[in-house]
Amino acid sequence: MIRAQLDRIRAVLPGGMGRVSFAQEGEDLVLARMFEHQDTGIYVDVGAHHPIRFSNTYLLHRRGWRGVNIDAAPGSMKAFARMRPGDINLEVGITAREETRAFHVFNEPALNTFDAERARTLDRPPYKVLQVCQVRCAPLAKILREHAIGAIDLLSIDAEGFDFEVLQTVDWEVARPKVVITEHFSRDLTELFASELHAYMTARGYQLSAKTFNSLFYTSATRQ
């Protein structure tokens, strides 16, 4: 069905121009360029949300990549199990330590968050918090170790305000992703370059290589 829909979209593009993106801000097209000579690889998608909608990794998945999809929302992995059976699909939150944490579930799943203050800000029409549930959480390094995942090519994080906490749970010596996507909501580039997140990434040997409206692309200085 998805391929049929894509064919219909391509049919209306003049002269076959244009490219289809599944990500929220075209992040998957940036990744396609970054990995244009790599047909297979391993991704880890934290805050994966949906196997296709707003997905940074679906375009790579179609090319032959496989990996780990992680989302804390109850029931979120049912669609992944059906549409990405070759991946490891995990319903768990990523935090600095093993714990159970309150998770705010919205009528728009892309807004789901552990951040109570952000949830209060977003809880207004047309969006609404449907429930607050307790979910299991653990550091990303522990989760990947449990599933025997070593070096990866791409780490994509969309944790709605908790991206920096997720980054701090990575074992950078083991995973050493070639590319990291994370969010930063400042519109001021001077503020971005002065941020704790940017300092953290540069200290680990990463450079800011691209940016969409909210997403930052960091590439490893030792990337092959």
PLM region descriptions:
Residues 1-224:
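Phosphate/nucleotide-binding beta-alpha loop and adjacent structural elements of enzyme active sites
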